[in-house]
Amino acid sequence: MDIDLHDYIATTPDFPEKGVMFRDINPLIGNGPAYRQAINELIDFARPLKPDIIAGPEARGFVVGSPMAYALGIGFVPARKYGKLPRKSVSSSYSLEYGKNELQMHVDSIKPGQRVFIVDDLLATGGTITATMDLVRQLGGQVVGTGFFIELADLQGRKKIMEVENVPFKSLLEY
């Protein structure tokens, strides 16, 4: 039986700042059947794209990408916030819906030519994902697709992704 994943997204107005409608995935990832369904839907989308590795930005991209990588029998590469990696890394800056940030990956985390599927919990403006795409490209990887639990359609993140690179795209829920 399919679960309506909308039932497992909590909405908090004016968080983290006024005017932002925060979509909280904690109820979804806290419910085994709903979490399993969401991960399986993204796996079903990613599998035909034949990724060699899954990548996801800190922190909630880890929650989406790690179980996908495990189920597909491939690795997971974290895109970490600035200053969290101890070895040589590449960096990419981006703007968030409510601020600015920088992501990094170790230089040996993706090998040239690897097929990379990028995931996150939520797509807003597209800054986090396009920064992750930039990191993958800096390391010689090929982005084969992107997937999200939630897409905030009004913020046009999908458009931003497609302007950077026209890749297969999947969001499970749209607000």
UniProtKB/Swiss-Prot annotation:
Chief site of localization: cytoplasm
Annotated catalysed reactions: AMP + diphosphate = 5-phospho-alpha-D-ribose 1-diphosphate + adenine
InterPro entries registered for this protein in UniProt: Ade_phspho_trans (IPR005764), PRibTrfase_dom (IPR000836), PRTase-like (IPR029057), UPRTase/APRTase (IPR050054)
PANTHER family recorded: ADENINE PHOSPHORIBOSYLTRANSFERASE
Gene3D superfamilies the record matches: 3.40.50.2020
Organism per entry: Oenococcus oeni (strain ATCC BAA-331 / PSU-1)
Native organism taxonomy: Bacteria, Bacillati, Bacillota, Bacilli, Lactobacillales
Coiled coil, from the record: none
Name of this protein: Adenine phosphoribosyltransferase
